[in-house]
Regions:
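Intrinsically disordered, low-complexity acidic/Ser/Thr/Pro-rich linker and tail segments
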Residues: 1-35, 43-78, 344-355, 375-397
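Conserved strand-to-loop turn within each blade of WD40 beta-propeller repeats
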Residues: 16-19, 58-62, 66-67, 106-109, ...
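Loop/turn segments within WD40 beta-propeller blades
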Residues: 2-9, 48-53, 94-100, 130, ...
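Terminal intrinsically disordered, low-complexity extensions flanking WD-repeat/beta-propeller proteins
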Residues: 268-272, 279, 305-397
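WD40/WD-repeat beta-propeller blade N-cap
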Residues: 38-44, 85-91, 127-133, 171, ...
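WD40-repeat beta-propellers
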Residues: 23-26, 69-74, 112-115, 154-159, ...
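Short loop/turn segments immediately following beta-strands, especially the blade-tip
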Residues: 158-167, 253-262
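A structural motif specific to WD40 beta-propellers
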Residues: 32-35, 80-83, 121-124, 165, ...
Length: 397
C-alpha cells in the first residue's frame, strides 16, 4: 500500500471556480498535465467516469443565474467537444452504476433524477429529500441507490422499484432512511463488507457512521475532533481515510466484519496525515497511494505507510472539487472497439397538469419526512432477473 506502478493510471481533476478552468488529466508520476478539457466547472461529487470511456460532470449553477442545470459528457478518445444536456433543474452530485447503464443526479431542491445513459431517457424523478442533495452512491451490487442531504438525512432506495416505470401503483422506492447525522452529509462510501451490505457516511457533525444497508441499522459511530468533509478507503478496504475541515486526514483501521466495532485505531492516538492548509475537498485512492485535494488549491499524493507526501500538485485555477483515477489507456485518444453509447439526457418533464390533460409518466415519491416508518427491505427472487433483462435490452440498442 502506497507503493505501486502509477504509470498505469492518471488523475482527473476539476474545479468549480469558472467554466474556463475545465478538466485536467495529470500524470501522477511526473505531475505533467497530459490533457486539458475546456469548459467545465463542477461542484463537489459532480464528476465521474463511465466505463473508463466517458467523463460526465454536472456544472455549477451560480446564484442569480437563470434557467436550469447542465451536465456535460466527454468521450475520452475525443475529449474536446462535450455532449451537452440541460435538465430543467440544477444538478449537483452524480452517481452511476458500475456498468454505466444508469446515471443519477441530485438537485439543490432535494429531487433526484435517474436516467438511462444509452438513449438519455429520464426513467424517474422524485422528491428524495427536503434539503439540498450532497451525495449519491450506488451499492456495490447496484441494487440500491443511497442519497445524503444537507440536513444530515441518509436514504436508501430500491433500484428495482425505481426502474419499474410501468407499475404506477407501486409503493415508494424508499427502503429506509436515517436522520442520525446532525449536520450535512459530506460522503457516502459503499464497501464490500459482508454480502455487500454495508456503507459508511461522513458528516460535518464530526462523525463517520457505518450502516447495514439492508436493515438500515446503525452499526457504529466514529467521532472526530472536527467536521469531516470527504472519505475514502484504500484499495483493500482495510483503512478508512477521513478528511477534515482543517486539512487533516484521519486514518482508521477498518474492519466491517467486526460488527460491534468496525472502526479501530491502532495505538493510543489516531493516525493523522497533515499536509494541507485548507479544508479537504476530495479524496481518492490509486495503486500509488492516497490522493487528497484541498481548498488550499493543492493535490497531494501520499505514501500512507511512511505518512509522507510523495508529490504535491498545484492547481492555481482554484480548489479542486473532484478527483477521479482512470487507466492511462483511457486518456490516450485511442479508438475504442465496441464503444459504450451515450446520448443527450432528456430534460425533466413539467409537472402533470390536469387542466390540459397532460400526464407525466414519471412516478413521484414523497420526501422521507412524509413517511412515518421505513419500508422493510426484502430481496426478491426476481430482482436479479429484472436487472439482467434490462441490461440485455439496453445492450442491444
Amino acid at each position: 500500500m502506497g507503493k505501486g506502478n502509477g504509470s498505469d493510471e492518471v488523475l482527473v481533476v476539476c474545479s468549480d471556480r469558472n467554466m474556463g478552468t475545465g478538466i485536467a488529466i495529470w500524470d501522477m508520476e511526473t505531475g505533467d498535465r497530459i490533457v486539458h478539457i475546456p469548459t467545465c466547472a463542477s461542484p463537489l461529487h459532480g464528476l465521474l467516469c463511465l466505463r473508463d470511456q466517458f467523463l460526465v460532470a454536472s456544472q455549477v449553477n451560480k446564484h442569480g443565474s437563470v434557467g436550469g442545470g447542465a451536465i456535460f459528457t466527454w468521450a475520452l478518445n475525443k475529449p474536446q467537444q462535450p455532449l451537452r444536456s440541460y435538465p430543467l433543474e440544477a444538478i449537483g452530485p452524480l452517481g452511476c452504476t458500475k456498468d454505466g447503464l444508469f446515471l443519477a443526479g441530485g438537485s439543490p431542491s432535494g429531487n433526484v433524477y435517474l436516467w438511462e445513459v444509452a438513449d438519455g431517457r429520464l426513467l424517474k424523478t422524485w422528491r428524495a429529500h427536503s434539503k439540498s442533495l450532497k451525495c449519491l452512491s450506488f451499492s456495490k451490487d447496484d441494487y440500491l441507490l443511497i442519497s445524503g442531504s444537507e440536513d444530515g438525512v441518509v436514504c436508501v432506495w430500491s433500484m428495482v422499484s425505481l426502474l419499474d416505470t410501468e407499475n404506477f401503483e407501486s409503493s415508494c422506492s424508499l427502503l429506509h432512511y436515517s436522520s442520525e447525522h446532525t449536520s450535512s452529509v459530506t460522503g457516502l462510501l459503499t464497501t464490500s463488507g459482508i454480502a455487500n451490505s454495508t456503507f459508511i457516511s461522513s458528516s460535518l457533525d464530526a462523525t463517520c457512521k457505518a450502516w447495514d444497508v439492508v436493515s438500515g441499522r446503525l452499526i457504529q459511530t466514529q467521532d472526530y475532533p472536527l467536521g469531516i468533509t470527504a472519505i475514502v478507503t484504500d484499495l483493500a478496504e482495510q483503512l478508512l481515510f477521513a478528511g477534515g475541515v482543517d486539512g487533516s486526514i484521519f486514518v482508521s483501521v477498518l474492519d466491517i466484519g467486526l460488527l460491534e466495532d468496525p472502526f479501530a485505531v491502532a495505538g493510543d492516538e489516531p493516525v493523522v496525515l497533515k499536509g494541507h492548509n485548507g479544508s479537504i475537498t476530495a479524496l481518492t485512492f490509486s495503486s500509488v497511494g492516497l490522493i487528497s485535494a484541498s481548498e488550499d488549491c493543492t493535490v497531494c499524493l501520499w505514501d500512507v505507510i511512511s505518512k509522507v507526501i510523495i508529490r504535491r500538485f498545484s492547481h492555481h485555477k482554484g480548489a479542486v472539487t473532484n478527483l477521479v483515477v482512470i487507466p492511462r489507456s483511457a486518456s490516450n485518444h485511442r479508438r475504442v472497439s465496441n464503444q459504450f453509447r451515450v446520448s443527450v439526457l432528456n430534460k425533466c418533464p413539467q409537472p402533470a397538469n390536469s387542466s390540459n390533460g397532460i400526464l407525466t409518466l414519471l412516478h413521484t415519491c414523497s420526501s422521507p419526512e412524509d413517511h412515518q416508518a421505513p419500508v422493510d427491505f426484502k430481496r426478491t427472487n426476481s430482482l436479479d432477473q429484472q436487472i439482467f433483462e434490462m441490461e440485455v435490452s439496453f445492450s442491444l440498442i
